[in-house]
Amino acid sequence: MKNCLTIIALVYSISFLAQTQNVRGKVMDSETNYPLAGAKVEIDLKNENGVNYRAVTDAEGAFTINTVPVGKYSLTTRFMQYEPKTQTIELNSGKELILAILLQESVTNKDEVVVNGRKKGEIINELAVISAQQFSVEETNRYPGSRMDPARMASNFAGVQGADDSRNDIIIRGNSPLGVVWRVEGIDIPNPNHFAIAGSSGGPVSVLNNKILGNSDFIMSAFPAEYGNSVSGVFDLKLRSGNDQRHEFTGQFGLLGTEFLAEGPLNKKGNASFLMMGRYSTLSLFQTFGIKLGTDAIPTYGDLAFKFNFKLRKGGNLSLWGMGGKSRISIMISEKTEYTTDLYGEGDRDQYFGTSMAVSGLNYKKAINEKTFVSSTLAYSQEVQQANHDYLQRSLTINGGDTTIQIDSIYPLMAYTFKTQKISSYTALNHKINKQHLVKFGYNADLFLMNMHDSALVDYYTPNVFFTRWNYEGSCVLIQPFIQWKWRMTDNTDFTAGIHSQYFSMSNSLSPAELRLGFKHKLSGNQSVFAGAGMHSQAQPLYTYVDNRKGAGNFFNKGMDFTKSLHSGVGYEKFFTKGFSVRTEAYYQYLYNIPVTIAPSSFSMINMGSGFTRIFADSLENTGTGYNYGLELTVQKYFDKSFFFLFSGTLYDSKYTGSDGVLRNTSYNGSYVANLLAGKEFKLGKRNILGIGTKVTTAGGKRYGLVDLVKTNAEKDLIYRDSMFNELQFKDYFRMDLKISWRMNAKAMTHEIGLDLVNILNTKNLLSLAYAPSLDPAVVNSPNYQPVSEKTQLGFLPIFYYKIDFRAGGKPR
């Protein structure tokens, strides 16, 4: 017994002694990606010899620091005639930390450049000097209520808010979610969400997984010339490469799915790696345990992602990457014996809905020399939406004290399939003329192949008599060349200018020259001021161009032009010690050329893009206008000393004018939004870490109008009075979230258990009005009868997960 206890104690003590990890990476010039040989990398932790853990980069800019105790530290990188960079790193025993460190060359000729108060979370694209935020996977993973979803994480930033708790559409400065572009490796990708409605940018569950992402950029306005076809914002996402020296694995099980990730070297030379992951939904399992998901129907979905990375001779890099997802849901109202309204469905029909998206690309990058860098991507993508509805004719059956619903008949109501394929090409070349001047130029080109079919009943009460709403097979191209110039006037002053051009063949629309300007100046005392302005254009959702409801071949909106925008902003920020910063920004955006109906009405494309409905517009013309202006404040302490907090607040106004000439609130004008997040980690012993975080969000209520009851009853759909559109507002939105996690570092592995309690107070926030007819004749015939109900957003939602990171073999070279 004594020997047994001794062995157990020995094994236990070894697990404590083994809590170390390696830090590896590459140091490069931030503008040309050229490797910096001889750069010094140092961690603020002393080893057994009394000196800090440190390394010097080799001829390829690579470094390795071995056997660093797990924990959080500051890592500083220095190189002659470059500005030093300090960042916080966190090591756990299950995954090696691999960094890509970008240093900016100094304009001065001093060997040692001193820069105080370097900001953690600096934007990766240095051409973006205003309204840009680094999307840090490490930082945003701590945000409660974000469900590990990039879009929901971004909704915590100033100027950004979610449109609906059940979806991740984001509203940027009062703009429609239609204006958001998702970009990966230079390519604009299809909507990366499950259950995505055609033309939208959001959905209930993201296909993207933060475990495959590196730090990325989120840009909200006056973005550099390389970005186009957007009047709102851009997610410029970076896919990380797999570990090229040893195999590592991640498994996770929870409410949102069961997933597995594997990464590692493809050969013993360490010049090729892979990263692969897959996820499948587990909602049905949790529904069985009585956890309410906001709908009686059980959605199913699965997704995968991969990246194969190959280091080529003479500094080139080739990567093959891809991601995709498939989802489906069946809302069977006919199976219910008691009438209920459903968040995702309508009470008078069975609905079957499925979507899929996939994108795969081949990217080549090479630092040609110390001054020139080229990146080129060729990609194929596809997205499909399929749906069919069966109409239910029902009646009430009363038997004694029991009332049940009787299905009298079921017949097809509508069906559609929208399929869009895209072949994309992107090339950009960065050339550093000298220390002060950088030029970047290139193009994006997309070839769209569309196959869109839709038919519906002419009349609800006449089965099998259909009319065609969409019947189109064809193609079009979108071409976007650009050129951008950056002038580093001094080490403290940057000026950028660029021109973006855009041509869309479907409507023969051309925006020949969109000017983009940016300016940033660093003041004394770790302060800076910045300003920017830009012209932007955006095409409409593809299917809206080929609406066929007015007869075969009569695509009455095929000539729609771009929506256009002039966006400007100014700002100020101050950096303090220990990762604390304050930032404020004021902006004004004027939108014009917005599609509105030819006949006078309140309709405007500016209000479209969120929710689960497509756009059914009449004949449109580009005469609508709108504006957004606001003031944003961000007070932030980045995660340091085991604590973080973030306050973001926005006061704004968002208005538009339709073809009737009336100035109205847009559907996204909540007037204000504020977020307060805070989190603290507690170290329990040598291996365990307890994390607690909370988030409080409040915002102006959603806009709505008076219902036209006559038209609503006739159309069997919710119809508002046109003259009163968006004149009313629901009560203010309020939600509180709480996140609790426990992490344990064991030998060669890390365990984590988390509970994200979304809307912990179960606040009943109003989402919208809905068409909800009664089946009771006594109710229908009453004088005050209205077939309208209020829909609330998601209530309390506990999201549980268990995650394990572990490694197998391999030693750093």
Describe each region flagged by the PLM:
Residues 414, 422-424, 469-475, 480, ...:
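Outer membrane beta-barrel strand-and-loop segments of large Gram-negative receptors
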Residues 193, 199, 334-335, 339, ...:
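Surface-exposed extracellular loop regions of Gram-negative outer-membrane beta-barrel proteins
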Residues 490, 588-590, 612-700, 803:
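Gram-negative outer-membrane beta-barrel transporters
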Residues 317-367, 382-406, 410-419:
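Flexible loop and strand-edge segments within Gram-negative outer membrane beta-barrel domains
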Residues 254-280, 293-332, 352-380, 433-441:
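Transmembrane beta-barrel wall of Gram-negative outer-membrane proteins
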Residues 645, 696-716, 733-735, 742-813:
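C-terminal beta-signal and adjacent terminal beta-strands/loops
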Residues 18-112, 118:
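Periplasm-facing N-terminal accessory domains of Gram-negative outer-membrane beta-barrel systems
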